[in-house]
């Protein structure tokens, strides 16, 4: 289930980028409220299989973000993303530990990856940041139980503090 948020003209240009920031429940809940975001979907980036069944295959929990680049650009989306992650933590966000909880920015568009590299390069702490930036080679939608999890079950665990989680949510 993709969540539709942005009510722009149907002719608006759409682009897609993928963010991995630990447990995908919180990442989806935060990003879906950003202005310019059309839709979000919980998924898995860059694993080796095309299924959610079976053993761990190297994927990163991620959120597919469909957005209107005339309303919010990639650099701005990355800035928002950095509000909810610890960019220095390798394979760990909050209490979630393991390679699937690594931080990453993925895309099929090289311009998105170049923007992400530039975003980090221009930070004073660039040498400490462990966010991976890679082409999206494989994406698998997460099972329905993970879609919109914190919307449906707002008291479930989330590594992102509530005051930040809903910072951009309209009343």
Annotate the PLM regions.
Residues 1-171:
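Flexible coil/turn and secondary-structure edge motifs
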């Amino acid at each position: 289930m993709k969540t539709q948020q942005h009510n722009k003209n149907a002719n608006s240009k759409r682009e897609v980028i993928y963010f991995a920031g630990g447990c995908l429940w919180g990442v989806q809940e935060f990003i879906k409220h950003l202005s310019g975001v059309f839709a979000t979907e919980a998924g898995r980036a860059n694993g080796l299989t095309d299924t959610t069944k079976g053993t761990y295959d190297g994927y990163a929990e991620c959120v597919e973000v469909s957005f209107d680049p005339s309303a919010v650009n990639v650099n701005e989306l990355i800035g928002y993303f950095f509000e909810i992650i610890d960019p220095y933590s390798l394979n760990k966000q909050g209490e979630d530990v393991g390679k699937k909880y690594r931080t990453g920015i993925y895309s099929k568009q090289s311009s998105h990856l170049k923007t992400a590299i530039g975003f980090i390069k221009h930070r004073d702490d660039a040498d400490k940041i462990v966010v991976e930036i890679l082409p999206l080679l494989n994406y698998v939608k997460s099972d329905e139980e993970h879609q919109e999890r914190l919307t449906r079950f707002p008291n479930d665990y989330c590594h992102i503090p509530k005051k930040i989680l809903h910072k951009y949510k309209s009343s």
